[in-house]
């Protein structure tokens, strides 16, 4: 497929902005997991879990999945029949971070933003050494959609930003100001680029994300917008837990800020599962290579905040039988009128993320 050339200018100059996740969606995109140096059991448990996530999303939203050519037969045998499989090379399966960020305008037009990608840190803490295929994913998706794209001069993953669609952007300094992303840019310069490419006007900076999150503290595991003026925050009451100070600091910031419209924020506290750790059984057959090794006893960055909003559905990870029910009940309160669907998601967590990380919504144009 001949790739389109990037558009000149920026989305903001052209009247485009990133809508909130609860805006109507035409589709959700995913990628096929196959790396045996990241996913256990030859990636089969992860593939089965991705299929369950896709099935849940597809009840309300069409699902498309990028699949490398050599795995197409396996994907066809595993994925629900109503999921559209698209031949596409990738280095791993994190569509939130490698896929396009879609922007829209008031005239029912949609375009894509292609960020630069360096596998969560490049040679300074990145999670694998070769990410050339991942760099091409966003434009392949936008070309498939026949949407023009902008090429943003910023290393950024989709999981590191959340917006309310009304001018406010939520993020973490731990990730966006990390020297392994854009060391040549200061905070003001990064904010200007986000204004230009997402159409936002106001920033809420949390210092840190979830403890031991190997993405360097992505916001989508820590805090997200529920609707304008309301956020969900990953929370623990255990003062001995290293997460406690992070959540308290975030709560302080959120309690003492306003959004782009001048609203004080309502804060929902979503309880942390666990703490959760991976086991010898879950790590012994993960191959060693140039990727970050998986070893038993590592604390997993499990979080119920890592859910997807898609067309009046909430797809959230089931992670711990002790807290899954509480998370479900809170999500019912947070999203009245939505279908709340839990999917067992430990296999995704073992690979370093969760449901929001493996999905990327395509807003309706």
UniProtKB/Swiss-Prot annotation:
Q: Does the keyword Hydrolase apply?
A: yes
Which Gene3D superfamilies does the record match to this protein? L-arginine/glycine Amidinotransferase, Chain A
GO-annotated biological processes? putrescine biosynthetic process
Active-site residues (renumbered): 357
UniProt EC number: 3.5.3.12
UniProtKB keywords: Hydrolase
Cross-referenced Pfam families? PAD_porph
- What chemistry does it catalyse, as a reaction equation? agmatine + H2O = N-carbamoylputrescine + NH4(+)
Query: Which one of the record's GO molecular function terms can you name?
Result: protein-arginine deiminase activity
InterPro entries reported for this sequence:
Agmatine_deiminase, Peptidyl-Arg-deiminase_porph
Q: Which family does it belong to?
A: Belongs to the agmatine deiminase family.
Instruction: Please report the name of this protein according to its UniProt entry.
Output: Putative agmatine deiminase
Q: Which organism is it from?
A: Yersinia pestis
What is the name of the gene encoding this protein? aguA
